[in-house]
Amino acid sequence: MEKHSLKEIIGLLKDRKISEKELLQHYFSRIDKFNPSLNALVSLRSIDEVLKDLENLKGCSVQKKTKSLFGIPLAVKDLIDVKGLPTTYGVPKYKNNVAKKNSIIVDRLIDSGALIIGKTNTPEWGLGSHTFNRAFGATANPYDVSKTAGGSSGGAAASIAADLIPIADGSDMMGSCRNPAAYCNLYGFRPTPGLIPEERSKTRHKKLPILSTLGALAKTPEDLAYFLDIVSGSHKSDPFSF
């Protein structure tokens, strides 16, 4: 499984060569084995919690074929709100800053059938070309744990490269998706600001020009395109979205 792209994994699920539960167990097994040395994922949920989400997803009336990420486990950069999980920004005083609702991108991922398992590590406030902070510590490179995974989406990059998750969101102002992707032998994409909507009322980016934008990291360009098709598009909370 660990060598497969997101699109290949989705194909295996559709062909029933692997079940959603088996996929989840596979990734949690790798997380248990490799995340202690990588420190790529933080604020992790338990597998039992995520399995309950999967059962609820299977019980809903919407057909699987309409859910483009059905049963895919994902983690979200620790600058982005996931209801019930802390958004720490890598800052110790925010370790108990539990989000009361999802960000727009998280709602779109969940609506597509994704299972949110936790957060990906980031430098404090997402500022830096290397991923380390006082809240959780440094993220290591899966190819050599004595080396950096880059930043600021270093937790996302290390998680994909180590096959802890198949794809991830990121954010990018001056290379924060592209830098860690290069460090971890992946593809990172910084889209035009507004392609992936954000709640601008929560950010300082209320006026043009907007420098920082949400983006994505993946094993293949095809995976990037697939992910962007899901999370992009206009939203009433973002006047610059399209």
Task: Give the label of every model feature segment.
Residues 34, 68-105:
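Enzymes and membrane/adaptor proteins characterized by extended Gly/Ser/Thr/Asp/Glu-rich
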Residues 98, 145-157, 171-176, 180-181, ...:
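Gly/Ser-rich catalytic serine loop of serine hydrolases
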Residues 117, 166-170:
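Paired acidic/hydrophobic, glycine-rich loop segments that form the ligand-binding mouth/hinge
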Residues 109:
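Nucleotide-cofactor and metal-assisted catalytic machinery
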Residues 92-100, 137-152, 212:
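Short pre-catalytic strand/loop immediately N-terminal to key active-site residues, enriched for Gly-Thr
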Residues 1-52:
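An N-terminal boundary/leader segment
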Residues 157-167:
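Alpha-helix C-terminal capping segments
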Residues 190-242:
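A short helix-breaking turn/cap at a secondary-structure junction
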